Amino acid sequence: MLNITLPDCSVRQYESPVTVAQIAASIGAGLAKAAVAGKVNGKLVDACDPIVEDSAVQIITPKDQEGIEIIRHSCAHLVGHAVKQLYPNAKMVIGPVIEEGFYYDIATEKPFTPEDVAAIEARMKELIAQDYDVVKIMTPRAEAIKIFQERGEEYKLRLIDDMPEVEAMGIYHHQEYVDMCRGPHVPNTRFLKNFKLTKLAGAYWRGDSNNEMLQRIYGTAWATKDELKDYIQRIEEAEKRDHRKLGKQLDLFHLQDEAPGMVFWHPKGWALWQTIEQHMRKELNAAGYKEVKTPQIMDKTFWEKSGHWDNYKDNMFVTSSEKREYAVKPMNCPGHVQIFNNGLRSYRDLPMRLAEFGSCHRNEPSGALHGLMRVRGFVQDDAHIFCTEDQIVSEARAFNELLVRIYKQFGFHDVSVRLSLRPEKRAGSDDVWDKAEQGLREALTACGVEWGELPGEGAFYGPKIEYHVKDALGRSWQCGTLQLDFVLPERLDAEYVTENNDRARPVMLHRAILGSLERFIGILIENHAGSFPLWLAPVQMVIMNITENQADYCREVAAKLQAAGFRAELDLRNEKIGYKIRDNSQYRFPYQIVIGDKEKQENKVAVRRKAEDLGSLDLDDFIAQLQQEITDALVNH
């Protein structure tokens, strides 16, 4: 007899072997119908997999996150089933789960159209309505190869070649369609009803631009119809907020093919940039940072010594001059070590906090570029803290407090923390990494924050704390980082004189709050839907006259507002006021000021905040109100 322990600690006995589906059926008909898969001793398995020894078992249903991911993975297989019925010559590649969805890469003779995707979705719905069972068969490797050879699935054969030698692999049968996978998958298509194909894109085989282009069909799937509806509404809202669309509408920036991954900032966009940079500079100065500037291009030997050449060369732009090879800096950290090394440093100089709005370039694949979110040329609000081991915790706490306050100023109140641990490709010994990872854990504990850990996600030179902000649509964006580095000071021979007159290596803390300014501005645009808070708006108000008679007074009002430090624009066009209000509304200025004869005579301004009419105000009172609004945002949050 088998002893099966359930999550409530109850134990049930079964004849050996028993499947997850059979266990669910023995508990109740409702659970049997809802069972998507199972978890046996912590490992996900198909509902049909046999259990042959005493085990702890959990029934996975669509209510579980694992259940949702299994549904999404099975929907990807269903895409394959529909595509092969409609386009028999298509070659299936891979179909993984991604955040809130899935995709399938497909090799086709000609690109799919939106109409093709609609036809694929319709066929998927027809297949779901057939309510067929998905059958898993563990198949010998040689037989699996034969199956895909007979079907002409060359990409599946390439994938099998890359796999470790195994006796058998899971082949999932969707009626006449077969696909290979580690699984698990749903036992029946009835679980796949709440899905939607969302977009079509191109993707290179293995993500390499030297390889052939494939067609990628994206989709999403959920446990219930309401969850799917909510997701679609969120996607539609996200499309309205797309920073690329709003960047053009608000006249902030543009990108063009002649400079891939590089941004052309327009006057309004550059005003937004400068507002952010100047605000950050003020905050950093108050926190004891010293601003520096380091070269854009440095000799190859410098990057070899820092370790970047061995670990990051493929992402660096390289040039040569006068028989010397140079690299454009992808990071600011090695340059900051040179400033630290320029002179004899004492323990009394520590902590030394060096900040730079550093312009960096990384050779990102062209297919990965995406508006402001993924660029090749960018500026980081970068800083490096050189300190002793005893100062790590206090510096981490101070940084955490600074970061949280700044995020609140920008409108982000929901911040989550993750600790990224050593990657496979790294510099430094395991002892050094043990020390660095434990140092960050102690720092996070001292900050009183909860965190999750991400094995393998650290930088090559050290572990890092990642700060993720949640935007108005509930999306999470990684912005801030704090990285602990014992490696670079050693490689670049950084040292200081200790209290005992010995020489010691400083600890180096790499930290950023916004990350890439370009990307952070993209996040801000989408979070605020282009309707920025007053202190941040590139144009804070527009002043409009009703007739030419008020033009001079409009200029006086603009001059007074500008003298008070506000970014005010004039609209004195010979147009009806209703038209000017509507036209300026598209730019989402925080305030619109309308001036007619009455306002001119009474030395007042008629104020509209977004769509709200605030009435006629004394100009000095209005300025005081604006100043208080900014104080509330930046000081009182």
Swiss-Prot record:
Q: Where is this region: Catalytic?
A: 242-533
Location (main, coarse): cytoplasm
Q: What is the reaction catalyzed? A: tRNA(Thr) + L-threonine + ATP = L-threonyl-tRNA(Thr) + AMP + diphosphate + H(+)
Limits of the TGS domain: 1-61
One Pfam family it belongs to: tRNA-synt_2b
Q: Entry's SUPFAM superfamilies?
A: Class II aaRS ABD-related, Class II aaRS and biotin synthetases, TGS-like, ThrRS/AlaRS common domain
Q: Which GO terms describe its cellular component?
A: cytosol
Q: Which cysteine pairs are covalently linked by disulfides here?
A: none
| GO BP annotations listed | threonyl-tRNA aminoacylation
- Cofactor stoichiometry and binding remark: Binds 1 zinc ion per subunit.
RNA-binding among keywords: yes
Could you tell me where this protein is found in the cell? Cytoplasm
> Which keywords fit this entry according to its UniProt record?
Aminoacyl-tRNA synthetase, ATP-binding, Cytoplasm, Ligase, Metal-binding, Nucleotide-binding, Protein biosynthesis, RNA-binding, tRNA-binding, Zinc
EC number from the UniProt entry:
6.1.1.3
Q: Which GO terms describe its molecular function?
A: ATP binding; metal ion binding; threonine-tRNA ligase activity; tRNA binding
Binding sites annotated in the UniProt record for Zn(2+): 333, 384, 510
PANTHER family hit by this protein: THREONINE--TRNA LIGASE, CHLOROPLASTIC_MITOCHONDRIAL 2, THREONINE-TRNA LIGASE
User: Which NCBIfam families does the annotation name?
Assistant: thrS
* Homology family: Belongs to the class-II aminoacyl-tRNA synthetase family.
What's this chain's function? Catalyzes the attachment of threonine to tRNA(Thr) in a two-step reaction: L-threonine is first activated by ATP to form Thr-AMP and then transferred to the acceptor end of tRNA(Thr). Also edits incorrectly charged L-seryl-tRNA(Thr).
User: What does the annotation say about its assembly with partners?
Assistant: Homodimer.
Q: What is this protein called?
A: Threonine--tRNA ligase
Q: Which organism is it from?
A: Neisseria gonorrhoeae (strain ATCC 700825 / FA 1090)
Which gene carries the instructions for this protein? thrS
